[in-house]
Amino acid sequence: MFAFYFLTACTTLKGVFGVSPSYNGLGLTPQMGWDSWNTFACDVSEQLLLDTADRISDLGLKDMGYKYVILDDCWSSGRDSDGFLVADKHKFPNGMGHVADHLHNNSFLFGMYSSAGEYTCAGYPGSLGREEEDAQFFANNRVDYLKYDNCYNKGQFGTPDVSYHRYKAMSDALNKTGRPIFYSLCNWGQDLTFYWGSGIANSWRMSGDITAEFTRPDSRCPCDGDEYDCKYAGFHCSIMNILNKAAPMGQNAGVGGWNDLDNLEVGVGNLTDDEEKAHFSMWAMVKSPLIIGADVNHLKASSYSIYSQASVIAINQDPKGIPATRVWRYYVSDTDEYGQGEIQMWSGPLDNGDQVVALLNGGSVARPMNTTLEEIFFDSNLGSKELTSTWDIYDLWANRVDNSTASAILEQNKAATGILYNATEQSYKDGLSKNDTRLFGQKIGSLSPNAILNTTVPAHGIAFYRLRPSA
């Protein structure tokens, strides 16, 4: 087996392409919420959104931070005589303002969708050339979030400058309305979005669309490996495919602007529990948005307990906002049914001096894996405090809600008080500063200088740790 290293490139580019603060004051941590597309596609309605929001609230997920309810494509019936977008009255009989008001009255934020093209991806009216009237439509309907796609763009791509100005037109139009609207680019990473996205948007997709597969290759997602500048992003991209493309991009994201690895597939399709845990952990660690793609009215207990794992969410919502770095990657011989097999180690700094560490097993069998302080603190000099200190190891999945408790919550449609973390009452930032034990996992040991962190990681699974300085 052999390894790939990206530390030199990442360290060099950090000084050249730094990340600006939020251009509009939003997105200080990655957004969390729910989006209709992964499960429902065009089968959307007012009732679906309101029922979903009620369920998210009842299950305690809203108070964990999942506050954006995002209506994706297929909501429009065209334009009126003045050129303004019109909602489909059969799907949304009371109009979008009614949906927004219901969500706002229940402490949610409302997201909608359009495309920087003549049409949306499903063939509905797009916003290319109509940015100002469409931005005003969204503002008039009290929208808080816009997902802005890339279909039917009339060939206006091919260089970063061309794509930048096409997406900047909507950014300027949204700002002109005077309403704070989170701007989420969905241009699939085309034309190196991660270099220019932070100046005009709060997040940007960096790859083709995700599918509920961990490693399965698909000809519709033609680029693999670390092809971060894929000329045809495609769709049906596996979790590992997207993660590997994201590996070198962390230096271009941070507070106010995030690499978006696409919606979460936890609870969608037939991923194993270990695959869902690895998926959620890595999206959290690289500071991708945490957007639920599942039908929350039919969640299985194990998926619910993943979405509600506060110690993992706290990694994502860490106020320092630095995505983790892939320190090493090895291909392995025990490939899965698709011929895929690799192992990786990721590490990243956290706001309170802690460090997050992941050992990721993309192979087909459980295996012993290990790492050292020298690898974990790869940027530190020999003799530094990080390398000469002892660190307590906290397992971020050890205190996961068990399936019996999760099933009871789902059946009763009510999260029992005190079981889940409530970020409405106490933000993740405040909870971390106060050392709230629910956000740190369970201590399982310590790692001293020159020692080795050893563990066994399941196939398509992860070992996920927070390291804290010993008292």
From Swiss-Prot:
Binding, substrate: 72-73, 147, 205, 251
Top-level class of the enzyme under EC nomenclature: hydrolase
Keyword Flavoprotein attributed: no
EC number: 3.2.1.22
Keywords: Disulfide bond, Glycoprotein, Glycosidase, Hydrolase, Secreted, Signal
Localization annotation: Secreted
InterPro entries given in the database record: Aldolase_TIM, Glyco_hydro_27, Glyco_hydro_27/36_CS, Glyco_hydro_b, Glyco_hydro_melibiase, Glycoside_hydrolase_SF, Melibiase_C
Active site as annotated: 149 (nucleophile), 209 (proton donor)
Disulfide bonds: 42-74, 121-151, 221-237, 223-230
Catalyzed reactions per annotation: Hydrolysis of terminal, non-reducing alpha-D-galactose residues in alpha-D-galactosides, including galactose oligosaccharides, galactomannans and galactolipids
Stretch forming the signal peptide: 1-18
GO molecular function, one term: alpha-galactosidase activity
Entries under SUPFAM superfamilies matching the protein: (Trans)glycosidases, Glycosyl hydrolase domain
PROSITE patterns linked: ALPHA_GALACTOSIDASE (PS00512)
CC per GO annotation: extracellular region
Glycosylation sites: 105, 175, 270, 370, 403, 422, 435, 454
GO biological process: melibiose catabolic process
Assembly and oligomerization: Homotetramer.
Protein family (similarity comment): Belongs to the glycosyl hydrolase 27 family.
Protein name as annotated: Alpha-galactosidase 5
The organism's taxonomic lineage, starting at the top: Eukaryota, Fungi, Dikarya, Ascomycota, Saccharomycotina
Gene coding for it: MEL5
